[in-house]
Amino acid sequence: MIFLYIKLADINYKEDILLALESSEIYKASLVEGINLDNALTRDLALFRGFFDKEHEEEKLVIIINALVDKKERIKEFVFILKESGLDIENEEIIRILTWEVESLKDYL
């Protein structure tokens, strides 16, 4: 089993990611919307809040998607679909994708 981690820093690609997951038959996934902490702490301090406009608020938002995938082929298909869509998957300012092998508790029962 493979754990798939996706950090989407450009939320404009959310639908592309979800469609690619579905097309590659990766269904058991969780999506969490959050805040990128790179600059959030500085911008949220009352002293600095006036220096930043609302236009940059959206760049703090990130989407985290986690999934357990049964076959590497599904992840390869997911990556292929993203490349075909024109998404620059190597640009970590847009998206970061990580995978690692995991074991389930049922493997020990």
Name what the model sees in each region.
Residues 1-109:
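Positively charged, small/polar-rich N-terminal and surface patches that mediate targeting and assembly
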